[in-house]
Amino acid sequence: MPLTAVQKTLSAQFVHMTATNDKVAQKFLKNANWKLDIAADAYFNSNPNMATSSSSKPKLDKMFSDLQDTQEDSPDELGAGSAIEYASSLGVDPESVGIFVLMELVKAPAFGVITRSGFVEGWQATNAPASKSGQKDYIQSVIRNLPQDHELFKRVYRHAFIAGRETPEQRALPLENALVYWQCFFGPEMPHSKPWVAKSSQSGGTTDFLDLWTEYLKNNWSRTVSKDMWNQTLDFAVKSTADSTLSFWTPEGSWPSVIDGFVEWLRNKGIGVASGMEVDS
């Protein structure tokens, strides 16, 4: 069966990452159900001639030291300035979802903070070449694959709650920060996002749920964003993108109260209502 356009793109990315050929790329991608990061890990793990985790550790440790600003950074951390400079050197826009892909890979404990252990262990796990160019190729491939790989997207999204904190001790995100992060993940105009936009069953047009969610929170939510609220927003976004009538939602469900309030607010506006359903006046 011929490859789809998406599969051809994934195959080309695999070849670029591993310096192998199309036949090998397609074999590993098929075995990994066309999940690029899983296929690449399987390839590197099956090839003893590739750089091993143990042999890459000294190189990664030196790379981390070279990235540090000796006057600003502590011995085992990159501060915000160094972290953003590093991200930019990999072609990662610090104002896009790509920054959260990188922060998840290195297990950043707060925004703009990269620890030595997170950097070394995170990159070791990828088996990507321990070089700036190797890391750039790898991270760009993962970023490009983000919208198509739901498990990867979910993993990066969930870690964004941790990486988006102002300090590791912070237990919740300020609303204004969370709104910016949601825009990175769900904004229709943002690169490599998963737009939180659904086809309307009534008008035949589209419903921009992210825009409505932002409006609702700005006018009705004065608290911070908890981890549970953050995680369940993704679940709600996925379901509402697939079903603009919100038929999956019930008052007896386990959604947080802020989402219950959002659904009620939407239905009072005539949004998220199945055809023929009455709306309380």
From Swiss-Prot:
GO terms for biological process: protein neddylation. Keywords: Ubl conjugation pathway. The keyword Zinc-finger does not apply. Disulfide bonds: none annotated. Gene3D superfamilies: Cullin, PONY binding domain (1.10.238.200), DNA helicase RuvA subunit, C-terminal domain (1.10.8.10), EF-hand (1.10.238.10). Residues 7-44 form the UBA-like domain. Residues 55-267 form the DCUN1 domain. The keyword Membrane does not apply. GO terms for cellular component: ubiquitin ligase complex. InterPro entries: DCN-prot, DCN1-like_PONY, PONY_dom, UBA-like_sf. GO terms for molecular function: cullin family protein binding; ubiquitin conjugating enzyme binding; ubiquitin-like protein binding. May contribute to neddylation of cullin components of SCF-type E3 ubiquitin ligase complexes. Neddylation of cullins play an essential role in the regulation of SCF-type complexes activity. This is Defective in cullin neddylation protein 1. It comes from Pyricularia oryzae (strain 70-15 / ATCC MYA-4617 / FGSC 8958). The lineage of its organism: Eukaryota, Fungi, Dikarya, Ascomycota, Pezizomycotina.
